[in-house]
Amino acid sequence: EKAGYLSEEECARYTAEPLKLNFHVNDHKDGVAVYFRDYLRRYMMAKRPERSDYPSWNMVRFHQDSINWENDPLYGWCNKNRKKNGETYNLYSDGLRVYTTIDSRMQEYAEQAVYKHVVKYLQPAFNREIKGKKSAPYSGNLTMEQVNKILMRSVRQCERYRVLKESGATEEQIRKSFNTKTEMSVFTYHGEVDTIMTPLDSIRYYKSFLRCGFMSMCPQNGAVKAYVGGLNFTHFAYDMCMEGRRQVGSTIKPFLYSLAMENGFSPCDLAPNVQQTYMVAGKPWTPRNSSHSRYGEMVTLKWGLQQSNNWISAYLMSKLNPQAFVTL
C-alpha cells in the first residue's frame, strides 16, 4: 500500500464498478472554422483539372482551377507530392500538420457575430416580410408557376430524388413521395426538432433560412484571419464565403473611384448630383438613387462615395472607359 499498490479487496471492489466514460467522437462538422477547414481540405486534395469534368457553363471555373494547379503549390498538394513509397498523401491518415493564418480568437468572435446578426436581426425581419405571402420564401414578384419551377429544380437536385430515380420510380411516384407527410428532424436556430411534414414542404422550409458569409483579411499581407461560410455546416454545407455568388452591389464603387483617381480625378473634384439619362447599348438608361440629399448641388467625389450615391457613380462611369473598369 505504501508503494502505491491496491490491496486485493480494493482491486476486487474497483473491478466490479462500472466504467465511467466521457467519450466524444471527433467529427469534421464540429469545432471552429468548419467551413474553412472543409475549403482547405478540398483545395489541398484537388486533382489535376480535366475539361471533361466541368459542365459547359462552368468553364471559367475550369480555367481558374487550371491556373491554380500550375501556379499554386498548395492547390492539389496531396496529389502533386508523393510519399517514399510513391503513393499520394492522405490528408487524414498521414499525420500531416497544416498551419494556417486563422486566428482562433477572431474566428470565434466572427462566428458569434454572424450568428447573432442573422438570428437576432436579419432572419426575424425576413420572416416578417414573407409572412402570409403565397410565394414565400420567394419574392412576391414571382408567379406561382415560377415558384413551383424553382422548387422542382431543388427537388431534382436532392438525394431523395436521386435515390428514387435510381430505384426505377416514375416521375408520378416521385411526386407522390415528395407530397407524402413523413417524420423527420429539421434544423432550427436552437437545435434540431422532430416534426412531420412532406419532403417538398421541408425544401420550402429550408429555403426560408437566410444564408451568409464572412471573411476577415489582413490588408497588409492578405492573411485570412477569420472565415465563416455559413451558420451550420451540417444543414447548410454550401460555402457562402468562397462558393457563393451574388451581385456585388455598391461594394464595386470603391473600385470605380480608384479607377477615377488613376485617371486624374481628385476626391475634391465636383460632380452634379442630379439624375441623368445615359445611352447604354443604344438604349436610354436612367439610374435611380435611394436618397435625394443635396439634389441639384455640385458635390465632391469624396461625398459621392461616402453616400454611395448612384448618380455620381454613373457620372464617373460616363467619363471613364468601361473596359478599363472591367480589367481593373
Task: Enumerate the language-model features and the residues they cover.
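Extended, non-catalytic substrate-recognition/exosite surfaces adjacent to catalytic cores, especially
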Residues: E1-K283, R288-S290, K302-W303, Y315
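Mid-domain, small-residue-enriched loop/turn segments at the edges of structured enzyme/sensor domains
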Residues: P284-N289, N321-L328
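Metal-dependent DNA phosphodiester-chemistry modules and their immediately adjacent helices/loops
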Residues: S293-N321
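Short glycine-/small-residue-rich flexible loop motifs, especially phosphate/cofactor-binding loops
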Residues: Y257, A314, Q323-T327
